[in-house]
Amino acid sequence: MRMASFRPKYITFDCYGTLTNFQMAEAARDLYSEQLDEPRMQEFIRNFAAYRLDEILGDWKPYAEVVHNSLERTCKRNGIKFRDEAARVVYERVPNWGPHADVPAGLAKVAKEIPLVILSNAMNSQIMSNVEKLGAPFHAVYTAEQAQAYKPRFKAFEYMLDMLGCGPEDILHCSSSFRYDLMSAHDLGIKNKVWVNRGHEPANPYYGYTEIKDISGLPGVVGL
């Protein structure tokens, strides 16, 4: 599907999950698979994801606290002893994560024509390690730490738009997540959206987007 009639001023991206291979589930398995059978492990991973979302809906706090609190709550719910060291191990893995295999080539093609921007639920001290692995130049990288708010809060998106000096009508926002990105983008009037279907969440056509299976499909969306 193409949007050849619309050439955005910027293409804005979620990073973790959309571009970077987000490996929280793998980290949880490494820590707890010996204590949980497979059905319980899958439930633990679902709980961990849910608590991470819940932890970021209030006032901003460092991502290390988000990981710590969500892992502690998940362990409590699943009857597992929580250790501070486990949360530290998970947090320190984040900057080591690289891109999905489809990302570098797809981004590089688009970056030749349209400035690329990241809006990430990240810490300043971690995100550039991930960005450097993506294989394409970025016009700007904005973090939750800079915005003092995590997505899906509107404040994070508003910070990005203010920093770019543009309106919601000027960008194309690209994410694999409705709950973190595309729902808020819709509510804020970002009409041009791309859903990268990486299997994290089911389709939700109400929110109005172009679907691609991976970043290799992005150039075609903007007529490249």
Give the label of every model feature segment:
Residues 1-10, 39, 108, 117-224:
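Asp-based, Mg2+/Mn2+-dependent phosphohydrolase catalytic module
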Residues 4-101, 112, 125:
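N-terminal helical cap/lid subdomain that shapes the substrate entry/recognition surface
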Residues 25, 104, 153-154:
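Conserved strand-to-helix beginnings and helix N-cap segments that scaffold or border functional pockets
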